[in-house]
């Protein structure tokens, strides 16, 4: 939705619309609880203009998508931090932000982890538990410097810091349910 190319935006709207239709067909309520989570897309050399295009193109989406859409912070410094999304998207169109702990390490927008988490939390409706994503670096887990630092690890070994907030945490790890099982064995 940030693209300056109309055909790219049209394709994105078509794809998101299909997601919204499927969610409707299986009876999921139209709230961010049943989220369609996306990264907002490229910055195209001008983040402010790209976020403005995102907000304008958001209005072209059907209600089945608009009511469920959430946005997530990126893992590259040149892309979108929680702070960018909060002021450039949420403040204009009210889309909740899914905080990704691992991505924040690479694109912090000048905020601490706690500040970014709590900013993202504040974007959610009060009757829905905010969603977050948590992963750890595969490079650090494997102690292999040839692995991209942003790559997800097999397991999540560190205790997830919620800073006293009530949040839903989606674990992103290569070993999926086994990773969650191991985390619960380690941290309860």
Segments the model singles out, each with a brief description of its role:
Residues 95, 106-188:
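Histidine-acidic metal/acid-base catalytic patches
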Residues 74, 102, 174:
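Anionic group-transfer/hydrolysis microenvironments
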Residues 69, 100, 169:
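Conserved, mostly hydrophobic/aromatic
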Residues 77, 102-108:
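Short acidic, Gly/Ser-rich segments with clustered Asp/Glu that frequently serve as metal-coordination loops
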Residues 1-96:
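Active-site acidic/histidine proton-transfer and metal-coordination neighborhood
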Residues 33, 44, 80, 86-90, ...:
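Sequence-level detector for tyrosine residue identity
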């Amino acid at each position: 939705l940030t693209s300056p190319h109309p055909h790219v935006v049209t394709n994105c709207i078509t794809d998101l619309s299909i997601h919204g239709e499927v969610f409707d067909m299986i009876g999921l309520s139209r709230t961010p609880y049943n989220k369609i989570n996306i990264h907002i897309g490229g910055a195209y050399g001008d983040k402010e203009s790209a976020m403005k295009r995102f907000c304008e193109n958001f209005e072209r989406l059907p209600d089945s998508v608009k009511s469920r859409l959430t946005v997530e912070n990126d893992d590259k410094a040149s892309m979108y931090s929680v702070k960018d999304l909060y002021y450039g998207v949420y403040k204009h169109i009210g889309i909740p932000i899914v905080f990704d702990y691992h991505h924040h390490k690479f694109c912090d927008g000048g905020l601490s982890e706690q500040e970014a988490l709590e900013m993202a939390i504040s974007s959610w409706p009060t009757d829905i538990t905010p969603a977050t994503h948590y992963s750890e670096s595969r490079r650090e887990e494997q102690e292999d410097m040839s692995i991209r630092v942003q790559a997800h690890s097999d397991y999540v070994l560190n205790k997830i810091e919620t800073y006293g907030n009530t949040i839903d945490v989606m674990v992103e790890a290569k070993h999926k349910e086994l990773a969650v099982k191991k985390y619960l064995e380690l941290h309860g």
